[in-house]
Each structure stands twice: as C-alpha cells, then as structure tokens.
Amino acid sequence: MPLVVEATDWTHGVFLGSNISSERTAAAEGTVGELRRDPFAMLPFCGYNMADYFGHWLKVGRGLRFDRAPRIFQVNWFRRGSDGRFLWPGFGDNSRVVDWIIRRVSGEVSTIDSPIGRLPLVEDLNLDGIDVPEADLEELFSIDTEAWKTEADLTEEFYDTFGAVSYTHLRAHETKAN
C-alpha cells in the first residue's frame, strides 16, 4: 500500500478499511513481524461478525449524500523498501501526510487516479527540511501489479472466513485492482 491513498467513494473506503493489515508485535498472538489482517483496526474489539460490521458501514454510506460523504484516506507509515528499511521517516513527519490530506479535502491539491485509489502528486507533499531520496519517494507510491493480484486472491480468502455473506460491493473494488 502506498504512503497515502484516497478512496474513490464511500464503498471503496469501506473496502480499504476492511483490508487493513499490520505486522504483529510482541503484544499480539503469533509470530512477531508476520503480517495479519485487522479490518478497521477493530478485530480484537468487535463483538460481532466482521461481515456484519462491514455491512453496517456500507449501510451508513447508503444514507449519505454523495456530495457530503466524508472523504476516506488510508495511510501506510511502515512501507519497507526492497532492502527492508522503512521508506518514510515517520513520527512527526507523518504530519506532512496529514497536511496533504487537509489540503486535499480543502480542494488545494489534486491527485493521480490509480487502480487502488487516488494518490498524491509527490510535489504536493511538504518535504521541506527532510531528506527522502527520490528513489524512496517513487517506491512509496509505486503499485506492484503482481503483488496486488496476489493480494486480491488473499482478500477473497479473508472475506470467506466470515461465512456465506454477500460482499458484492466490496468485491467490486477488489476486482478493480486486478
């Protein structure tokens, strides 16, 4: 996942949220560093089937006017380069991405459409005072098509763990990435 992506609409935002994953830490069961799915970062806290939880957010979206629905963004502070190091400096510099999101919602900056959502133009990020090599910026916003095809298959398997529930709307976004 790139450093930041804007959902194309509410349903796409629910799709993005339903597919959040993170590396396990010492505080979570399983192998430290292993990637695990944690929809909406709510899996340990949700007291009912996640499919119903996804359905709730889709229903909320149906009640929103298109022009007034909140914008949804997903961030990836922890993307690693091919050498295993973090590409983004993180910590206080994350505010630079939040600044871009605020300017995006205010209509001050535009985006590039991609198969996974709307991406910022790198020149619209405030990078004053930090040294992020051009190659790292390119990798931060690159989309590996083959990896996304694999991810789409894993997403299908993940959704299936919640039982025989129709994810027509969410699965429509999944196929766009292929």
Predicted regions and their residues:
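Intrinsically disordered or highly flexible coil/loop and linker segments, enriched in small
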Residues: 104-111, 146, 161-167
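Extended, highly charged clamp/arch subdomains and adjacent linkers
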Residues: 157-159
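C-terminal helical/tail subdomains of lipid-metabolizing enzymes
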Residues: 94, 139, 143-144, 154, ...
